């Protein structure tokens, strides 16, 4: 067995751990000490071929009995691998071979793989097709942050301006780092432009945060309090997530309107973005009309994949809404718990001040301090519940609405194609009736007209079929990308959320363990 198997080559580029051994060290002290070998034999200082293969991922060698073949245990390894001899030529093949990476122990491979995954990709001048090919890995060297919310103006004419900072090495941008000031309506205008360009052809455009009339009215006319500050912070975080999702899309990243939004110091004011304007009311009417059309159109779905995905997103939407409501209730519960804990701490402190017993008074005062710290922990955990978990669910509820929107546009595209086919059929029937009519004076002119109309509608039918096939192909690709992003986002947020819970519980344990000696000291 051993004679038929050649040991794997050892690279001479890097010394292995065995070469660091001194001549006097015995490599197989625990195993070879029981063997009866000649003092001049180099077997104890040699590396057997079986031991080399045992460290690899290949098949395990047949187990050798020490009592049966003691003399042949190291017979094949005495000349191939010797730690005492610097020569390694005997273990190399005599046939010419291409350059091979030196074989290293398996324990040294893992750090190299980690270092490769940690290296940041360098992205320079790329075409749209190249960026779309990298969409599966979502490798885009661009970072976007929204910060420094600032109130501009007074009264009902006031608005909030946000600083949008971009850092990138993509050559499509004029600078590697730049920042601009944008108001909320600018974000809505950007989404409106992108949706009008890409939504009807099957691209999933990330939705912008919804406009809140009540919240913004408080910010405009009210003083700065905790509720208005919390509203501004929620909106800032939502705008940042919106831009980050938008620039992750390989097609949207190439759009000139997006680049203008990120780079241009002066941006034309977005129009038709107000909720109570005429355009806002028109959008509401159009949404209602689309809902009615969706109920009346009966599409003969021939693709089982689309039927399955539509049902999947309907169920996912319902479950996300239920979970979001539960998390919102959890956030309210933690805030209420924080308020009750603060009230308890205040009462314990007052009781400690009125207590005559020194040890008990000190213990009550310490208990009040612990409860104040726990109150702070409950507040921090409530923020984590909201900003990590609740906002993620809220974002994906809107994203699923965008996904359902592209499915609706596919249905509209099919309806347009179907209408063109029906019209073409009617034109051909009219031509057939004209051919059997006994009016030779008018038949030639009418025949030419109807033939032109038939050719026109034939072209429309062909175009409708191409559009339907193209939007179906795009939606398949977009849904696959959406699913990958969804799993990645949920994994990241769940891990961070669990880490915050663990950290909170560990801090609680520390607080109570520190207070326990004070309670035991009461005498």
Curated annotation (Swiss-Prot):
GO BP term, example: early endosome to Golgi transport
Listed name of the protein: Sorting nexin-2
GO CC terms: cytosol; early endosome membrane; endosome membrane; lamellipodium; retromer complex
Main location group: membrane
Modified residues (Phosphothreonine): 101, 104
Quaternary data: Predominantly forms heterodimers with BAR domain-containing sorting nexins SNX5, SNX6 and SNX32; can self-associate to form homodimers. The heterodimers are proposed to self-assemble into helical arrays on the membrane to stabilize and expand local membrane curvature underlying endosomal tubule formation.
Annotated membrane topology: Peripheral membrane protein
Region of interest called Membrane-binding amphipathic helix, as start-end residue ranges on this chain: 278-295
Domain BAR: 299-523
Gene (UniProt): SNX2
